[in-house]
């Protein structure tokens, strides 16, 4: 039998229970056709790179499958029919990855960073804001100097002349 990594995206408004039911349904199909699901990972709700079927987020689920190609064809057929599945992808691999996938390792790494307790650092002494302190604050990059063929800048009108029209 062949080894596959199968990922599907479920709608963001599907509850976690519905996603678990979809996963169980896919597992049942594989086992019914003589295969087995060796690993299931729910990556949770993640933002999509672009909108798919009017969804900006989706539940991501990974299945590592050891099954005949007929089982994969049936899973994909069922996912095309299901309204809860936005996208899916099956990739045949030489060997299945042991342990957590790269996405789960990344999630663990991010969780460890959050545990460091960075949080709000409070006010900085003297209001220091990097290289902006005491330097030029906005406007032209050259400070209003030479403007090439555009000629000199006209003086600004005072605020009083702008309100005279009322």
Swiss-Prot record:
One of its GO terms (biological process) is translation. Residues 105-159 have a biased composition (Basic and acidic residues). CDD domains: bS6. The keyword DNA-binding does not apply. The gene is rpsF. Keywords: Ribonucleoprotein, Ribosomal protein, RNA-binding, rRNA-binding. Belongs to the bacterial ribosomal protein bS6 family. SUPFAM superfamilies: Ribosomal protein S6. This is Small ribosomal subunit protein bS6. Residues 97-166 are annotated as: Disordered. It comes from Bradyrhizobium diazoefficiens (strain JCM 10833 / BCRC 13528 / IAM 13628 / NBRC 14792 / USDA 110). Coiled coil: none annotated. Binds together with bS18 to 16S ribosomal RNA.
